[in-house]
UniProtKB/Swiss-Prot annotation:
Residue intervals of the WRC domain: 114-158
Name of the protein: Growth-regulating factor 3
Highest taxon above the source species: Eukaryota
GO terms for cellular component: nucleus
Residues covered by region (Disordered): 145-176
Main location: nucleus
Length: 387
């Protein structure tokens, strides 16, 4: 008869028990443990024989980065010798990925470099780009070079009179005077007012002596309406004018001693001849000019040249007056506002030659042919401008 619990005997059971393996020891258990240990040893040997995850250079770089991290944590500035290898590594990395150096951004550059330096850089903001060659000193071609500049307004030529060739300094002053009057477009009345010369090359005074200028019989100066100096200076363009004792002269004329000497000579001669040719007004109607006719030409020529302040021009233009009305209107507008009493002249000179002579004078300055005609009216001693 079989035993009921025979299956529970370890000797009867040759199969390994999956339920309680620890309760019994099978004869094959020792062999399995040895094989398991052998497998684990083989795995460990394979793990030990495997190469390390970092190379020696990578370990060195890792140590360097750890040192930089320690500097950053401590709040101490990182030395430059620790940052140079990192910069070189970034440069080598950029050259590895971008074979052409201009195609990449590169290290420490703010913008992308131009892949085609010699080509015009005008684009539409997308893929299109101008195919023309750029100018030598510009990054754009000739067509696109001035696109961004404001060129809506062109410069306006302010000079109204065409420049003329400068005559030699040895030419007579009368020829210079006639050329200056006839070529000036702002004063046709004076240019055509010569009595005997007309539009020719003679003096503008019509009958005056060479080297002098006097008002012609058909030309008078009327300065009734006040006009600014810009009416005369508008035809001069951008010339530099300066005030002098005998009118407004260009700056270029002041630097030439020969021209200045010729002008002074012409002015002095015309000043000597001025009273005899323009003194056609009635002296009796002006008490202050009672003894003007007594002064001879030598006394007038010996008068000193008084420096005057910058003057204003009165009158808008020069007009021609009929010969019938010439006797009553000659130079009268210049003396309408003179004081009638002698007490109004407190600071007259005590000189005998100047005691009865008014300080109000009329002088006409005649520059060269390339300059503009200028007229000055002097100022009286009490500060009143004559008109």
């Amino acid at each position: 008869m079989a035993m009921p619990f025979a299956s529970l005997s370890p000797a009867a059971d040759h199969r390994p028990s999956f339920i309680f393996p620890f309760c019994r020891s099978s004869p094959l258990s020792a062999v399995g443990e040895e094989a398991q240990q052998h497998m684990m040893g083989a795995r460990w040997a394979a793990a030990v024989a495997r190469p390390p995850p970092f190379t020696a250079a990578q370990y060195e770089e890792l140590e360097q980065q750890a040192l930089i991290y320690k500097y950053l944590v401590a709040g101490v500035p990182v030395p430059a010798d620790l940052l140079l290898p990192i910069r070189r590594g970034l440069d080598s990395l950029a050259s590895r990925f971008y074979h052409h150096p201009v195609l990449g951004y590169g290290s420490y550059f703010g913008k992308k470099l131009d892949p085609e330096p010699g080509r015009c850089r005008r684009t539409d903001g997308k893929k299109w780009r101008c195919s023309k060659e750029a100018a030598p000193d510009s990054k754009y071609c000739e067509r696109h070079m001035h696109r961004g500049r404001n060129r809506s307004r062109k410069p306006v030529e302010a000079q109204l009179v065409a420049p003329h060739s400068q005559p030699p300094a040895t030419a007579p002053a009368a020829a210079v005077t006639s050329t200056a009057f006839q070529n000036h477009s702002l004063y046709p009345a004076i240019a055509n007012g010569g009595g005997a010369n007309g539009g020719g090359g003679g003096g503008g005074g019509g009958g005056s002596a060479p080297g002098s200028f006097a008002l012609g019989s058909n030309t008078q100066l009327h300065m009734d309406n006040a006009a600014s100096y810009s009416t005369v200076a508008a035809g001069a363009g951008n010339k530099d004018f300066r005030y002098s004792a005998y009118g407004v002269r260009p700056l270029a004329d002041e630097h030439s001693p020969l021209i200045t000497g010729a002008m002074d000579t012409s002015i002095d001669n015309s000043w000597c001849l001025l009273p005899s040719q323009t003194s056609t007004f009635s002296v009796s109607s002006y008490p202050m000019l009672g003894n003007l006719s007594e002064l001879d030409q030598n006394t007038i020529c010996s008068l000193p040249k008084v420096e005057r302040e910058p003057l204003s021009f009165f009158g808008s233009d020069y007009v021609t007056v009929d010969s019938g009305k010439q006797e009553n209107q000659t130079l009268r507008p210049f003396f309408d506002e003179w004081p009638k009493a002698r007490d109004s002249w407190p600071d007259l000179a005590d000189d005998n030659s100047l005691a009865t002579f008014s300080a109000t004078q009329l002088s006409i300055s005649i520059p060269m042919a390339t300059s503009d005609f200028s007229t000055t009216s002097s100022r009286s001693h009490n500060g009143i401008y004559s008109r």
